[in-house]
Amino acid sequence: MPELPYSHIRGIIFDLDGTLYVCEAFADTIQDAAVSYIAQLLGIRQAQACQLMADTRARLTKSSGTVQTLSAVCSELGGNIRDLHRYFEENLHPEDYIARDERVIRLVKHLSRHFPLHIYTNNNRPMATRIINQLGLNGLFQRIFSIDDDWLAKPNEQALAGILLKTGLTPAEALFVGDRYDVDLRVPEQFGCPVYLSRTVEQLLRLEELLAGRGDPV
């Protein structure tokens, strides 16, 4: 990925899960909930559903050449994304897993004084809101773009074009930050947006240093 064109950036669009926080235990819980949903849907055992989903993800990834999302896997197996996210809302409890990180709070507050900040997530709005509140980041993002806005899961060119339109940012002005290149960053980069891959909190915290090179001091 190219170096960030600092002087052009006028807004930042963050992924949520795995980007603004990293919690393997909660990620595992999301996966387990999806397995339970598919097991109930198909009338099979948990272990069978888990293996079926793993095989399906591997097949889809091989045929497409890109890593496939949980939404894509469940849809391929006959699941309904609306029902899947309803199941998530009813069964997931992020408050039991996600810990607040004061370093991230300071970073996001600092960036919000210099850029409009937004969230673009494959999570649903109620769950995303609960996670943002748990992280202590409520009120710092101008807009939250979630999967239940139009039920177009990332990566999706139509959804991305709509986000750029709604934020009033040109591709060159919109920095996308995410932990999965194929899911969060590949399409924005194809649009001409600067992107930043962040898979750890330490990588996320480097944003302040990297963006200090833009025209206005950060």
Question: Residue locations for each model-derived region?
Answer:
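Asp-based, Mg2+/Mn2+-dependent phosphohydrolase catalytic module
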Residues: 1-12, 82, 105-109, 115-218
